[in-house]
Amino acid sequence: MDKIIVEGGQTRLQGQVVIEGAKNAVLPLLAATILPSQGKTLLTNVPILSDVFTMNNVVRGLDIQVDFNCDKKEILVDASGDILDVAPYEFVSQMRASIVVLGPILARNGHAKVSMPGGCTIGSRPIDLHLKGLEAMGATITQNGGDITAQAEKLKGANIYMDFPSVGATQNLMMAATLASGTTTIENAAREPEIVDLAQLLNKMGAKVKGAGTETLTIIGVDALHGTEHDVVQDRIEAGTFMVAAAMTSGNVLVKDAIWEHNRPLISKLMEMGVEVSEEEDGIRVKADTKKLKPVTVKTLPHPGFPTDMQAQFTALMAVVNGESTMIETVFENRFQHLEEMRRMGLQTEILRDTAMIHGGRALQGAPVMSTDLRASAALILAGMVAQGQTVVGQLTHLDRGYYQFHEKLAALGANIKRVSEA
């Protein structure tokens, strides 16, 4: 098991950093490659992450040919032959996002069996919205133990209202609807950039998806889809993480290829704090002096609100800002576990249900800490950069699910950081 060692206290990040393709986009894109019964699908700008390897194995387990060229960051998928309808348990159980293969397998085969998914332990994350939507489209759903079985000779278009704009459920239902008979409308749909990216891929495959990025999606079913080529959108969460890293170290960093519109909620809060954020031709530049930053209140919301996947990193920034900041987490429960670890570093915080009060400006001290989930891993590493002394971050399996060469990118910007293998 690896660990990351950070020598903090004097870090001031400077330079430029290249952002990878989005983890939260490529996983549903890979699920979508199950749908075409003709031709091959080529995905480019693919991030090299453990979750991507897991999803590759899920798709490959359906008797689909999957070739991952890590050097080129490309995945070529050929699902043109007959495919299996049971997703492999050993891989589905490792990752929450694997539930999005349920809709594509069902739409393609008329039958699908998927185990309950695994992944980060940051709340219950129920999948009832996925199942209700498929039932509205005519599927019969049964749950037996840890398995979900769905059956429908031919899915039918339906009007679906989602009680919550779930990203995963929107993706699952959108993919299933592409091969349904008739028109499907999804109201209160998720609006994230990753939804738009998926819709673009589906339309290149021959689907008829309209309204991506708005509250209402309309999908007109077609008889079959075909392979295509698609470039994975840039990772707004990785970009946001480096923006926060620059701000909390009084740095000056150009985040290359970052998309302003995708990061607008985060940028707004950084600017409210007093961080200088500017759009340049090849990315977004972030400059800050932490001594001049002001405390803020942030509430996480579905897009276009402040992203829950930036909550942990932003609380690390709050820790270095003089005064009392407030973080309200409305999307997932149980997502303040990283603050318990940061208390070991001297953070003063009070947590009451969905709200954390951060008493910032007091010097953090290096300490051994453990990652509790993907984004917490990044937050603890960032906190280590500004803490006095050495911080050792363990349990890096979470980090590798969503960040590629994170420590190397930080080191290139000036951080005193290394990754070592534990004996």
From Swiss-Prot:
HAMAP family linked: MurA (MF_00111)
Could you tell me the EC number(s) of this protein? 2.5.1.7
One Pfam family per UniProt: EPSP_synthase
Q: In which pathway does it act?
A: Cell wall biogenesis; peptidoglycan biosynthesis
- 2-(S-cysteinyl)pyruvic acid O-phosphothioketal modification, residue list: C120
Q: Which SUPFAM superfamilies match?
A: EPT/RTPC-like
Natural source organism: Streptococcus agalactiae serotype III (strain NEM316)
Alphabetized InterPro entries for the sequence: Enolpyruvate_Tfrase_dom (IPR001986), Enolpyruvate_Tfrase_sf (IPR036968), MurA_subfamily (IPR050068), RNA3'P_cycl/enolpyr_Trfase_a/b (IPR013792), UDP_GlcNAc_COvinyl_MurA (IPR005750)
PANTHER family documented for this protein: UDP-N-ACETYLGLUCOSAMINE 1-CARBOXYVINYLTRANSFERASE
Cell cycle among keywords? yes
Q: Catalytic site residues?
A: C120
Q: What is this protein called?
A: UDP-N-acetylglucosamine 1-carboxyvinyltransferase 2
Please describe what this protein does. Answer: Cell wall formation. Adds enolpyruvyl to UDP-N-acetylglucosamine.
Gene3D superfamilies, per database record: Enolpyruvate transferase domain (3.65.10.10)
